[in-house]
């Protein structure tokens, strides 16, 4: 009897656990598409990344990485499936990081990229903060990824606001 009760209890607890949704595989890395991207340029991209809370507070991307990800079939897949449809994707092919330009946002969520090649990019960062819940003072992470698609021409100096 005790073994049956224990087994029933374990099964009940296991059924309460939430499972993460399965990750969606990505397309094959389009190496030729990436190899054809310009490696250097003269444009400047600067801007600010933030989110507003429901209460109207502004939360900055202070200290977070900001990336310029060239628009390709591979990054478009990420944009459509992950950013728009909120579907979990497997980790990207590590070769993609050779083509992404990175910087760090300052304390006001401002960022700047120099010597950017002409092309289309996703400017992407994370803006997150913790807020109290109704569960004994526990904190919950809020916010998330923000991204904006931009077009950069040679010699441009453009200002971008990245938010929802």
Q: Predicted regions span which residues?
A:
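Positively charged n-region of N-terminal signal peptides that target proteins for export
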Residues: 1-4
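Sec-dependent N-terminal signal peptides
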Residues: 6-9
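C-terminal motif of bacterial Sec signal peptides marking the signal peptidase cleavage site
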Residues: 12-15
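Primarily secretory-pathway and cell-envelope proteins
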Residues: 17-85, 130-164
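Structural detector for hydrophobic anchor residues on beta-strands
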Residues: 45, 101-103, 123
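Short, surface-exposed beta-strand/beta-hairpin micro-motifs centered on an aromatic residue
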Residues: 108-115
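A short, solvent-exposed beta-strand micro-motif common in secreted/extracellular proteins
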Residues: 119-133
